[in-house]
Amino acid sequence: MSMLFEARGITKSYALPGRPPLPILREADLSAAEGEMVTIIGASGSGKTTLLNMLGTLDTPDGGSIFFEGEPLFQDGRYRMTKKELARFRNRRIGFIFQFHHLLSDFTAQENVAMAEFIATGRLQPAKERAALLLQELGLSGRLNHLPSELSGGEQQRVAIARALMNQPKLVLADEPSGNLDSENSQRLYELMAALSKERRTSFIIVTHNETYAGMSDRCLRMQDGRLQLCTPLQ
């Protein structure tokens, strides 16, 4: 299994008025192989989302290194790409899933999934066709023309997953993806992500405070005191 992504010694502190900087990440190390599903658990405020933002190039670490397919992405205190190049990298190589779906309320499920590709290419019909295939794969073939308000919470999150997969990313970063779902839909969501990681050879890094479903992942890490440690999740 080839290594897709590796972060070494990631540090991050935030300045506080009149006080010393508050360290959030203390030399955190993380790797993900191709097609591997990694879950990061930990208490709220432990730095899980901060780390995910660093991995997704949405924020800048204070120190450490990030490698993608063996090539340095962040090293020696700076990203190795311009802001424009980083945005292109994110759009092409990384998919994002958030606790809040951020679906466009005036657009159908199919249009929400197709939107980013349409904006990038200017070709609507091919984007809609690919979106329809993805939604069908995720069990939503009968919901293509439904607005977000007409979908259940679980269906909305599956639309968000389809949107994240639209650019055929190598890596998907998910921040509390089941936070607004009941236990039954949360279980289905994690089962779906586990299946997708194997079928598509897509790596998933999932952040959650809920240990119940972490056992479905290939590897579980616990965020504690700004560092990541192997953990044994609840079964």
Swiss-Prot record:
In the bilayer, the protein is annotated as: Peripheral membrane protein
Q: Which UniProt keywords apply?
A: ATP-binding, Cell inner membrane, Cell membrane, Membrane, Nucleotide-binding, Translocase, Transport
Q: Name one GO molecular function term.
A: ATP binding
- Which EC number applies? 7.6.2.-
Where in the cell is the protein located? Cell inner membrane
Give, as one word, the top-level EC class. translocase
User: Keyword Calcium: yes or no?
Assistant: no
Q: Where does ATP bind?
A: G42, A43, S44, G45, S46, G47, K48, T49
Q: Which CDD domains match?
A: ABC_MJ0796_LolCDE_FtsE
What InterPro entries does the record point to? AAA+_ATPase, ABC_transporter-like_ATP-bd, ABC_transporter-like_CS, ABC_transpr_LolD-like, MacB-like_ATP-bd, P-loop_NTPase
**Entry keyword Transcription:** no
Q: Where is the ABC transporter domain?
A: 5-234
- What cellular component terms from Gene Ontology apply here? plasma membrane
**Quaternary assembly:** The complex is composed of two ATP-binding proteins (LolD) and two transmembrane proteins (LolC and LolE).
Q: Which PANTHER family match?
A: IMPORT ATP-BINDING PROTEIN (PTHR24220), LIPOPROTEIN-RELEASING SYSTEM ATP-BINDING PROTEIN LOLD (PTHR24220:SF689)
Its biological function? Part of the ABC transporter complex LolCDE involved in the translocation of mature outer membrane-directed lipoproteins, from the inner membrane to the periplasmic chaperone, LolA. Responsible for the formation of the LolA-lipoprotein complex in an ATP-dependent manner.
Q: Which family does it belong to?
A: Belongs to the ABC transporter superfamily. Lipoprotein translocase (TC 3.A.1.125) family.
What name appears for this protein in its UniProt entry? Lipoprotein-releasing system ATP-binding protein LolD 1
